[in-house]
Amino acid sequence: MKRKKQDRQRHLKETIDANPFITDEALADRFGVSIQTIRLDRMELSIPELRERIKDVAQKQLDEVKALPMEEVFGEIVDLQLDERAISILDVKKEHVFSRTGIARGHYLFAQANSLAVAIIDDDLALTAKATIRFTRQVKAGERVVAKAEVQKVERDRTLVVVNSFVEQELVFSGDFLMYRSAQEQ
């Protein structure tokens, strides 16, 4: 459905504000226009390209991962509030998928969610004690997975972290991670 330029640009800004990780291709599909039109609209509205938007979100990251080295985190953490919430993104590439079907291997989605659950813990030691996971939709090469983690409950040496992963706005993975941590000081 084509819209008038001003209306389209207003909706474009709202869409990007709601999901800064959305690609120009996805926006073009959503608004029924060419990728070039989306890029021109972004330029007119002074909205940076995807890479710059990701960097902007990452610069707002307030806390530093304690429980594991950054190079061991699977996916790129773009927001982190220790013991509260975290967000990471994973661009699914051909090395992440089965060659015959083009569907992402489940352990990559689990690795992204699990490493985010470890990273969110405000402790030098964090281990997964138990995980209950659900895959709700297949993920294919070329899709971007945005994982959002939230701490639900903190006890002496256990923390419950809930992770939901999305492609666009569609849930593709969810998990409840019971994390072991060294006992918190009282």
From Swiss-Prot:
SUPFAM superfamilies: Thioesterase/thiol ester dehydrase-isomerase (SSF54637). It holds the Pfam family 4HBT. Transcriptional factor involved in regulation of membrane lipid biosynthesis by repressing genes involved in fatty acid and phospholipid metabolism. Belongs to the FapR family. This is Transcription factor FapR. InterPro entries: HotDog_dom_sf, Thioestr_dom, Transcription_factor_FapR, WH-like_DNA-bd_sf. The gene is fapR. Keywords: DNA-binding, Fatty acid biosynthesis, Fatty acid metabolism, Lipid biosynthesis, Lipid metabolism, Repressor, Transcription, Transcription regulation. One of its GO terms (molecular function) is DNA-binding transcription factor activity. Disulfide bonds: none annotated. One of its GO terms (biological process) is negative regulation of fatty acid biosynthetic process.
